[in-house]
């Protein structure tokens, strides 16, 4: 009987210390979609060089909210780095949204940014440029190589925990101290 893969949507991937790839080292990725065709997610702990004010200005969206303008945009991953992805907690019917899990949504349409600029957006939102993608079987292979830990998604971690604490913070949700792990094993 064939094994049906378990979907990791609504989970966080936490890079293990042995994952040295420049893009994903010490990263935390929120998996938004995962099926037999592959997986898609966004990194939630890597700052980009842009503020939301700069991104909104590029899109000709104006706002007088200084806090919103100064908000950091995250590097969501190496796929479609020119495209915006908004992780949020607002169940309204945006033009292009995906339910990630309980209280977590991914929206890629302009209307959510316009609502945020007017002060009518989600209570909690993280804006990223780019996303991460895995082909069919690729994520499963990386998991079997011990590149990642999987942790149930946690809105408090995604929206509230400071960026520099998210990597260890996600692992600690399942009792793992990443600073005590080694990337080798063997006999003495």
Swiss-Prot record:
One of its GO terms (cellular component) is cytosol. Pfam families: DUF179. InterPro entries: AlgH-like (IPR003774). Gene3D superfamilies: VC0467-like (3.40.1740.10). It comes from the Bacteria. NCBIfam families: PRK00228.1-1. HAMAP family: UPF0301 (MF_00758). Belongs to the UPF0301 (AlgH) family. This is UPF0301 protein Smal_0940. It comes from Stenotrophomonas maltophilia (strain R551-3). The lineage of its organism: Bacteria, Pseudomonadati, Pseudomonadota, Gammaproteobacteria, Lysobacterales.
